[in-house]
Amino acid sequence: MDSKITRLIEQASVIVGALPYLQAYRDKTFLIKFGGSAMDDARLVKKLMRDIVLLEVLGFNPVIVHGGGKAISKAMAEAGLEARFVNGLRVTTPEAISIVERTLSGTINPGLVQMFRDYGGKGVGIPGTEIFVGERIHEKDEQGNPIDIGEVGNVIGCLTERITEALELQITPIVSPLAKELGTHKPLNVNADLAAAALAKELKPVKLIYISDVPGIMKDPSDPSTLIKSVTRTEALDLIKDGTVSGGMIPKIHSAIDALNAGVRKVHFIDGRLPHTLLLEIFTPDGIGTEIIREQR
């Protein structure tokens, strides 16, 4: 058989292999959060936007929450402001919050929307301040003394009307990670992972997918071959207790479990540095990253 025909048959087989997933997930909501160094490579971002457009065309309902930490640090440096962190939280002065808001909702978000539309998608940008309700975080040092970290908050609620309206029109919402402070209505800088989990608790998507710059949960963080493909909520907590999961992955895991407890079916952690990582996770039996599930296998 001609080699070209063979390749075409193989491509057709891949499409047919996706049939069970297309049948299972059509008209279902997927909440996709991406950030980290994966956002620094424009080629990867464009490929990801194209893949999400494909999901939209196939009848899925994607919702995107994006990050932008490195772009914020760059914008602050250009403005002569030093990036400082306390307990992993970016210190955000009143002067800095305007830069954060301008970078996230005024630069990154419209750029992603334009990429999405360039591939034929029907995306709409929504500032996080129209979705997330926040309260200010009050940090303390080791002696218990208060530390002022500025305009930084936790998400305590979500206003989902704009998102549900967009989904009803088969338009993909693309949301920036900012919250409006309860009472004052001032913008607050919030963790994008935790914001995505809070939104997932309200929307209850079939999947909450975190796309970052790590392959997933690994027994040895320096060895990708130790990737753990699937864990339950209890097993994930055990990985934190025994030290397998540490650092920045801990709040991600806790937020994932909160989402599962609220009704999300599965949470996935995948590597955004790999082309088509999202499609491989959704449309193949074994996936490419780590999934956290509610039920025992």
Swiss-Prot record:
Subcellular location: Cytoplasm
GO CC annotation terms, alphabetical: cytoplasm
UniProt keyword annotations, A-Z: Amino-acid biosynthesis, Arginine biosynthesis, ATP-binding, Cytoplasm, Kinase, Nucleotide-binding, Transferase
Chief place where the protein resides: cytoplasm
Record's catalysed reaction(s): N-acetyl-L-glutamate + ATP = N-acetyl-L-glutamyl 5-phosphate + ADP
Region forming the signal peptide: none
Gene Ontology molecular function: acetylglutamate kinase activity; ATP binding
Residues binding substrate: G68, G69, R90, N189
Site residues, Transition state stabilizer: K33, K252
Enzyme Commission number(s) of this protein: 2.7.2.8
The protein's annotated pathway: Amino-acid biosynthesis; L-arginine biosynthesis; N(2)-acetyl-L-ornithine from L-glutamate: step 2/4
Function statement: Catalyzes the ATP-dependent phosphorylation of N-acetyl-L-glutamate.
Family per record: Belongs to the acetylglutamate kinase family. ArgB subfamily.
Record's protein name: Acetylglutamate kinase
Organism the protein comes from: Akkermansia muciniphila (strain ATCC BAA-835 / DSM 22959 / JCM 33894 / BCRC 81048 / CCUG 64013 / CIP 107961 / Muc)
Phylogenetic placement of the source organism: Bacteria, Pseudomonadati, Verrucomicrobiota, Verrucomicrobiia, Verrucomicrobiales
